Amino acid sequence: MKIAIPVDNNSMDSSVCISFGRAPYLLIYDTETEGSNFLDNSAAASQGGAGIKAAQNIVDSGAEAIITPRCGENAAEVLKAAEIKLYKNTNNSIRDNIESFKEGKLSLLDDIHPGFHQHGGK
Amino acid sequence: MKIAVLSGKGGTGKTLVSVNLAAVALDSVYIDCDVEEPNGHLFFQPKDLQKERVTVKLPQADPELCTGCRTCVNFCKFNALAYIKNKLIVFNEVCHSCGGCLLFCPQKAISEKEREIGLIQSGISGNVRVVSGMMNIGEVSGVPIIKKLLQDSRKENKNVFLDCPPGSACMVMESIKDADYCILVAEPTVFGVHNLEMVYELVRIFQKPFGVVLNKCLEEENPAEDFCLQNQITILEKIPFDLELGTMHSNGQIAVRKHPKYKELFLNLLKTVSKEARHETASDT
Ligand code: SF4
Ligand code: SF4
């Protein structure tokens, strides 16, 4: 099964990125083959809707689960429609989180924030 | 002449200044661009109300025609579209209604539907035509409403007073785009200076002629005034801190219609502003 993690760098020694939509890279990790693939998150630089685009990229990668510290409302809607499960990371290490995931120790992410909209003038 | 009244945050006296200026001018239009919390109409209590819906266009895909090519998803710069499980999802609040996806869909699968985001209400209060933009609750951006307000105001040849949204974000920029002159309202505190600086930056970026009205002035030190002096900013008027004025305002009364003292103060301000604005236009040429 493939899982996705927003990460700060394109290396397994990198850490989980605190942002989902604006993470520089998205790690797609295959739990069976243990292969890892780092996608450039093309959404990171976009003006708005970064979460939506990042979520679309993850869906397109074929991942079935995501480990992330947080997720915006819109992105969550995309992931829900794609039936991708969201898990909350326990710490910053990619490897630790993958291990915890394999052992079924991660809990589902329920903290979905309303998103930071640049427009609207607030 | 179109005059925009702005301040870095709410409660500074922006509505006090714009409402009273409009009321003291002979024949004028007051436009409330603070679409999230319009309250100018509470003072004017306009009659003969007319309401007009403001809508934006939203794309929708016909699942029968859509082949899932994702041309639209890739095109949308605002990332308002996602294609998931053979279905196009449109994020209403993210969509800017640019119509691009509709143009670029090779299957002609996208059509537009209207969605109401707010309304514009206008009416008459004595010498003032009062126009207010009101954004529906839960909407993210009032920019389309402000655009519509300003479009309508372009037809006016009377003096127009724009009560801008607080702050300095998109909606404020939209509001001051066609103003001939900007009045910045500031409070005499350190926070007041901070808020003033925000709008000061903005009017400079937009290269608008402007001046400051210092509100709630006491005899004591006034950091906002110091800021103006340091930066050679024109001080148009100093409105004294005055319980009577505050009470009238919080009771929804228009000071210039109640009290000759304030009528004189705002008439003076209007004169100063007109002179400043004319001076600016003259030196442009
Ligand atoms: S109308 Fe424009 S902003 Fe809205 S979804 Fe289509 S391309 Fe994106
Ligand atoms: S461009 Fe048209 S056909 Fe292609 S995914 Fe979008 S709606 Fe469907």
Walk through the language-model features, giving the residues of each.
Chain B
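Walker A (P-loop) phosphate-binding motif
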Residues: 1-25
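Short, well-ordered beta-strand core segments
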Residues: 4, 28, 182-183
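Ferredoxin-like iron-sulfur electron-transfer modules
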Residues: 8, 21-24, 45-68, 79-97, ...
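Short beta-strand-centered segment that lines the nucleotide-binding/catalytic pocket of NTP-utilizing
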Residues: 28-41, 114-119
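Switch II (G3) loop of P-loop NTPases
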Residues: 34, 132-138, 146-171
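Iron-sulfur cluster-binding cysteine motifs and their immediate structural context
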Residues: 71-89, 100-115
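Inter-motif core of Ras-like GTPase G domains
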Residues: 169-190, 196
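C-terminal lobe/tail of nucleotide-utilizing enzymes
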Residues: 202-285
